């Protein structure tokens, strides 16, 4: 679907947040989230609805020491004809390939980006020097950590949301090994293209002010499938009703974008949210004619964003009720 058509559908879907109705309760939102999650998104449900964090302020803290390698290392894998996993056990990094180069989505931590991304690409027979663009979903250390490495060593262009470029530049303690230089500031609906690979940016502020989600196409034995990639999920922003309004609006916006693009594959930058690690392992058992483990269907993709939105609405309502 053309960019203009997708944006038109998205705009119509998010023209305004709901007002509280007499029947609205915290429990009604939690039940709706649990129903939508089913057995597909239990990790997301547990993180957002069962024990969401209560954040009072965003702190510019220095990164902690690197954890033991066995807590994060995992071998890279070819997942689709043109998409490769070069992430860790907990955090994802994806390489979308084309005849003219690679688009890398997210870059893990500083401490593991060398081994998982650079080393992983080489293990898969891919050349890190062919990474033309690095798209950062949001400027937290578990996703932006390897951006400077890719920029400095391979000349990759770094794409990030404007507010997250701003926070990166203002950070005093968050980048002891250096920051990526401000490069491409992403716009809503922008396409990042290398050869026959293209990623459409959907700005989804909430998790951070500059969070980016994405729509792109992968191929499964030559069959094209559309991916909806969620760029930020957890409630690690200050717990205020206006902040949850922003988050909820973005979840609805991304749900509309995914539906407009007929996305049947869901991916996230945290493996707990899309079950990437077990799904990759299950590919070894896939028989001819069986659906791809990531190809969950359009309805399931939509249900993911129902989970995130309903959990957020429950938290928002708790805040409003606590003030009454």
Question: Which sequence ranges carry the predicted segments?
Answer:
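Bacterial N-terminal signal peptides that target proteins for export
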Residues: 1-6
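Bacterial N-terminal signal peptides
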Residues: 7-16
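Accessory terminal helices/loops
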Residues: 20-66, 221, 233-324
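Active-site HxH/HxHxD metal-binding segment of metal-dependent hydrolases
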Residues: 23, 28-32, 111-115, 119-191, ...
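Metallo-beta-lactamase
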Residues: 63, 78-80, 126, 130, ...
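Conserved beta-strand hairpin/beta-sheet module of binuclear metal-dependent hydrolase folds
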Residues: 69-124, 128, 213-235
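Divalent metal-coordination and catalytic microenvironments
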Residues: 82, 96, 106, 138, ...
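Active-site environment of divalent metal-dependent phosphoester hydrolases
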Residues: 112, 139-145, 165-168, 209-212, ...
């Amino acid at each position: 679907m053309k960019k203009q058509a997708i944006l038109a559908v998205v705009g119509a879907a998010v023209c305004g947040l709901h007002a509280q109705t007499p029947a609205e309760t915290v429990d009604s939102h939690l039940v709706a989230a649990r129903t939508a999650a089913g057995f597909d998104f239990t990790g997301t449900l547990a993180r957002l609805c069962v024990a969401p964090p209560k954040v009072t302020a965003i702190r510019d803290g220095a990164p902690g020491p690197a954890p033991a390698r066995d807590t994060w290392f995992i071998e890279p894998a070819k997942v689709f004809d043109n998409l490769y996993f070069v992430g860790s056990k907990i955090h994802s990094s994806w390489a979308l390939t084309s005849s003219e180069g690679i688009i890398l989505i997210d870059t893990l931590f500083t401490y593991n980006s060398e081994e998982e991304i650079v080393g992983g690409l080489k293990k898969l027979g891919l050349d890190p020097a062919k990474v033309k663009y690095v798209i950062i979903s949001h400027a937290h250390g578990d996703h932006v950590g390897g951006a400077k490495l890719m920029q400095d060593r391979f000349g990759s262009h770094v794409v990030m949301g404007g507010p997250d470029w701003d926070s990166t530049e203002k950070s005093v303690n968050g980048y002891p090994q250096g920051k990526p230089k401000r490069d491409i500031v992403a716009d809503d609906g922008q396409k990042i293209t290398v050869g026959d690979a293209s990623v459409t940016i959907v700005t989804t502020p909430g998790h951070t002010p500059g969070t980016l989600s994405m729509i792109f196409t992968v191929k499964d034995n030559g069959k094209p499938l559309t991916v909806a990639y969620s760029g930020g999920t957890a409630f690690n922003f200050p717990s205020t009703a206006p902040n949850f309004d922003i988050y909820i609006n973005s979840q609805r916006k991304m749900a509309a974008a995914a539906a407009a693009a007929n996305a049947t594959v869901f991916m996230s930058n945290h493996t707990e949210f899309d079950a990437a690690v077990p799904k990759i392992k299950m590919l070894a058992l896939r028989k001819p004619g069986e659906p791809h483990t990531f190809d969950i269907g359009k309805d399931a993709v939509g249900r993911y964003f129902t989970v995130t939105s309903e959990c957020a609405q429950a938290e928002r309502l708790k805040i409003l009720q606590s003030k009454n």
